[in-house]
């Protein structure tokens, strides 16, 4: 079974660590690559600088409220790029604002999940994301150059 590569873009280290830990326990081989802001996310996806030797991820979990280039800008840039636009992107944000949900889908997000405030629900949400995207959904796989 091929390892699924996930790009996790979240500026909260505690959330990022917990998400990585939950996905690693999912049962399917998974490698989570974490970055803390939108500039790093785009550099990772374009394999620039220190990310030149990284794999293009199979899936991305993206927070909206990031320092510098926010998640909306990252989403717009990725979905406008002919090489990257097929990358499935799940928004995982503390925002429950209808305008953030609508904007994310308008920009091409594949799903929008609000981060729960309590630990049990947070774990359940990340587990559900993993079960759907790694267990049910078929992820597009491009040949790695």
Where are these regions (language model features)?
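Active-site residues of response regulator receiver
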Residues: 62-63
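Conserved acidic segment of CheY-like receiver
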Residues: 3-14, 19-24
